[in-house]
Amino acid sequence: MGQKAKAQAPTTHPRPHTLSSQVAPALPRRPRHAAPESLRQARGEVMKAHLITYGCQMNEYDTHLVQSQLVSFGADIVESPDEADFVLVNTCAVRGKPVDKVRSLLGDLRKQKAQRSLVVGMMGCLAQLEEGQQIARKFEVDVLLGPGSLLDIGAALESNERFWGLQFKDELHDHIPPPPSGKLQAHLTIMRGCDHHCTYCIVPTTRGPQVSRHPDDILRELDMQLAAGVREVTLLGQNVNAYGVDQGAKLKGYPSFADLLRMVGASGIERVKFTTSHPMNFTEDVAAAIGETPAICEFVHLPVQSGSDRVLRRMAREYNREKYLTHIAQIKKHIPDVVLATDIIVGFPGETEEDFQDTLSLYDEVGYDSAYMFIYSPRPGTPSYKHFQDLPRELKTERLQRLIARQKDWSARKNAQKVGTVQQVLLRGDAHDAGFLEGHTRGNHPTVVPKAIGADGAGVYQVRIDHATPHMMYGHILGPDGQPLPEQPRFNPEAAAVGGALPML
């Protein structure tokens, strides 16, 4: 990548409120290798940077934002940490497992620092927490940036001391990064932070209160993405349904999320998706906007977390089973062919077998196409960690396996209904087997097809689905006449299997 790119100048808008700040503590000078005086003076040459991302799509967007800053400063982005002068790790703190991965990675990087000149940085949600700051001290991290201080990356690397940036800064919300290069898909952040306080969730602590981006900035960034060839955009926020209502106040000049969807859908973009939704703020108008706007994909991810009212109260989710099912009915009314996904936390403190059966029965009542399913992970700093006693891991794991089996059954049934249909599929590029292409439908179904004459690369195609498993669909690209295009290799679904476990069932 190595090309220089100019960062988009921010547009300023009157802010309805100012985010709180944290003062970074003074830190000792670097014990081994001082930071370069500038990005252009690392070992007398252009700095080489490598970025590693854990966690959600918001983190992927933030990594792209910081990477674009580094490129605009003159840094080269390299493919391997072994080639890099600067390694920056974007972290996740939602569950314990990604935190353990960060510890392991930082341990390896600390060993490398003992052998060569290397600057190590840590950003993202974990960096904002005391837990992450203790990890940073232990593993001699040089640069620490919270989610609200990402634009401090230049100042951090020009510092001759360890640099901690943990403030929530308004200018981050107005900054527009350049679009991704050569990609058909892009993320677009419409807001940051969250005003809900679910008892298990650390996000309000790590990302601060909700701040909606001005619609003009959103549409400007979308225009840049369209000009760069993007054909599918995913709108990102911790709670997109609350867009334009920050800390309980409706913002003047900001549309509702339903109207923002209509605006984005009318921009010329081919496909629009969004995540994440909170049922408390979901409205029927959002379902109506999806149903009436062709560009908005008929895919709705509406996390329920539990089918038990008692557990939902302990989670402080602010809705009950009946209200959630009302939203599902509204969605199915306006989007008859909707593809539904959800999130489930299994084994929340105090969950009984009866509570878990309520979750299983909700599955049968809704009929989810896919789900992200996790056992409860206690996170320091959350109310559930402080006040509730965790369930035995063996019990949580056993319930998770039962839930996975239930979801697998539903996924198999739902995917089987797609066999013989024609789906619009965005193909990103080569699958695990180079003779095949992989991508996803408008309903987010992972799909694999053989390369065809005249269709052997990334693009948006009509695909006839010929075979489906609970995890994957297989098909053939159709030509303008509706007939399958001639294949390049012989179609072998087993050879096209995508490597690695899929996150959704």
Curated annotation (Swiss-Prot):
GO cellular component: cytosol
CDD domains on file: Radical_SAM
SUPFAM superfamilies, sorted: Radical SAM enzymes (SSF102114)
Any one Gene Ontology molecular-function term assigned to this protein's record: 4 iron, 4 sulfur cluster binding
Catalytic activity as recorded in UniProt: N(6)-dimethylallyladenosine(37) in tRNA + (sulfur carrier)-SH + AH2 + 2 S-adenosyl-L-methionine = 2-methylsulfanyl-N(6)-dimethylallyladenosine(37) in tRNA + (sulfur carrier)-H + 5'-deoxyadenosine + L-methionine + A + S-adenosyl-L-homocysteine + 2 H(+)
The TRAM domain, residue ranges: 416-479
Cofactor: [4Fe-4S] cluster
Cleaved signal peptide residues: none
Binding site for [4Fe-4S] cluster 2: 194, 198, 201
Keywords: 4Fe-4S, Cytoplasm, Iron, Iron-sulfur, Metal-binding, S-adenosyl-L-methionine, Transferase, tRNA processing
Record's subcellular location: Cytoplasm
NCBIfam families per the UniProt record, alphabetical: miaB-methiolase, MiaB/RimO family radical SAM methylthiotransferase
Function summary: Catalyzes the methylthiolation of N6-(dimethylallyl)adenosine (i(6)A), leading to the formation of 2-methylthio-N6-(dimethylallyl)adenosine (ms(2)i(6)A) at position 37 in tRNAs that read codons beginning with uridine.
Protein name in UniProt: tRNA-2-methylthio-N(6)-dimethylallyladenosine synthase
Organism annotation: Deinococcus radiodurans (strain ATCC 13939 / DSM 20539 / JCM 16871 / CCUG 27074 / LMG 4051 / NBRC 15346 / NCIMB 9279 / VKM B-1422 / R1)
Gene, per the UniProt record: miaB
